[in-house]
């Protein structure tokens, strides 16, 4: 048997394995409880969290094939919590010896952070159990270390691969009220995008404008993609308390209030602390400027580029803390505050 035949047989075996795994997952999904979300898509509840069917199918792929290296870094978040910013900061930090912050060809000047740091469940393992990890900029070279990945999944969903081989995980948490407002604005800025389960032929609901009230009620009920929000946040909060060497819990509000302190904290956690020479030469401030909302949003790639039908410019809005005050009624505020207080009781986590 020549080399071509061996490779062909290996591919056929892999395809058969993926088909069998996909069928097993479909059988599992058919037995799960489900609800209709504010986008008109089915959400399935699996091990306490809500997923679209196609995202749910990526979980077995991640569990069976994702093998973290000790030097890997996973940027984790609930969506609309500062993910884009944290991806940019993390890449700039760990790659600063390779990519000078003053280089006019720095990758962040020509690539959106979501291109550079791929999602495990969306970009890599959504349709494959053995994705090509080398096609992404942050892991394109065999000598590229650390590799950078991201996820919106809870820590509970990632425990299996991380147990086999722990790596560094950075989680950014944001006040749920600002998450709600940011999500609503983001969805309405991308009205032409078919959100949700792309394997679903028809949405049950179609709307020109996404209802803020509907999104609010879904969050309050905990029925939202990767939700409930409070369980998601608590999974990483517990991880940071139990294993601070591998899990860092960051708050968006603290990043905004004291960016220099928080970026230095992030660098320490990622084992790439700033030297005295770097601090004296303003390296911290250069990273903050490179990754700032004003700088990233002004770049041509982020003004005109897109990925998956989503315009990059819609990832950059106000980035303000407390913007929810312009959108939420006092009744809404009281309701969600009471729910969050109750759900977080005894955890030590507060907003």
From Swiss-Prot:
The keyword Zinc does not apply. It is an enzyme of class 2 (transferase). Induction: Up-regulated by trans-zeatin. Residues 12-22 have a biased composition (Acidic residues). It is found in: Cytoplasm. InterPro entries: P-loop_NTPase, Sulfotransferase_dom. Disulfide bonds: none annotated. GO terms for cellular component: cytoplasm. The keyword Cytoplasm applies. GO terms for biological process: response to cytokinin. Pfam families: Sulfotransfer_1 (PF00685). SUPFAM superfamilies: P-loop containing nucleoside triphosphate hydrolases. One of its GO terms (molecular function) is sulfotransferase activity. The active site is at 152 (proton acceptor). Sulfotransferase that utilizes 3'-phospho-5'-adenylyl sulfate (PAPS) as sulfonate donor. No activity with brassinosteroids. PANTHER family: SULFOTRANSFERASE SULT. This is Cytosolic sulfotransferase 9. It comes from Arabidopsis thaliana (Mouse-ear cress). The gene is STO9.
């Amino acid at each position: 048997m020549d080399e071509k035949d061996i490779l062909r047989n290996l591919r056929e075996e892999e395809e058969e394995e993926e088909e069998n795994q996909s069928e097993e997952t479909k059988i599992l999904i058919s037995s799960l409880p489900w609800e209709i979300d504010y986008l008109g898509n089915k959400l399935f509840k699996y091990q306490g969290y809500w997923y679209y069917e196609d995202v749910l199918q990526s979980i077995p792929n991640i569990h069976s094939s994702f093998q973290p290296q000790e030097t890997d870094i996973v940027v984790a978040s609930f969506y609309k919590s500062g993910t884009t910013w944290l991806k940019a900061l993390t890449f700039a930090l760990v790659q600063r010896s390779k990519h000078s912050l003053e280089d006019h060809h720095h990758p962040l000047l020509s690539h959106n952070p979501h291109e550079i740091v791929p999602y495990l469940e969306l970009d890599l393992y959504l349709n494959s159990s053995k994705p090509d990890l080398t096609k992404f900029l942050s892991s394109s070279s065999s000598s590229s270390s650390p590799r950078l990945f991201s996820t919106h999944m809870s820590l509970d969903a990632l425990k299996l691969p991380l147990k086999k081989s722990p790596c560094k995980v950075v989680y950014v948490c944001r006040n749920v009220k600002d998450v709600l407002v940011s999500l609503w604005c983001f969805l309405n800025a991308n009205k032409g995008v078919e959100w949700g389960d792309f394997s679903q032929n028809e949405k049950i609901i179609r709307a020109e404008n996404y209802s803020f009230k509907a999104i609010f009620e879904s969050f309050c009920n905990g029925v939202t993609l990767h939700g409930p929000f409070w369980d998601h946040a608590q999974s990483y909060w517990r991880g940071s308390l139990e294993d601070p060497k591998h899990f860092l819990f960051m708050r968006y509000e603290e990043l905004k209030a004291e960016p220099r302190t928080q970026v230095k904290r992030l660098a320490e956690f990622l084992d790439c602390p700033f030297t005295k020479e770097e601090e004296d030469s303003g390296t911290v401030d250069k990273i903050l400027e490179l990754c700032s909302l004003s700088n990233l949003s002004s770049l041509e790639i982020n003004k005109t580029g897109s990925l998956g039908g989503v315009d990059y410019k819609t990832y950059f809005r106000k980035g303000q803390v407390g913007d929810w005050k312009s959108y939420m009624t006092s009744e809404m505020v009281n309701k969600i505050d009471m729910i969050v207080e109750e759900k977080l009781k005894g955890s030590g986590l507060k907003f």
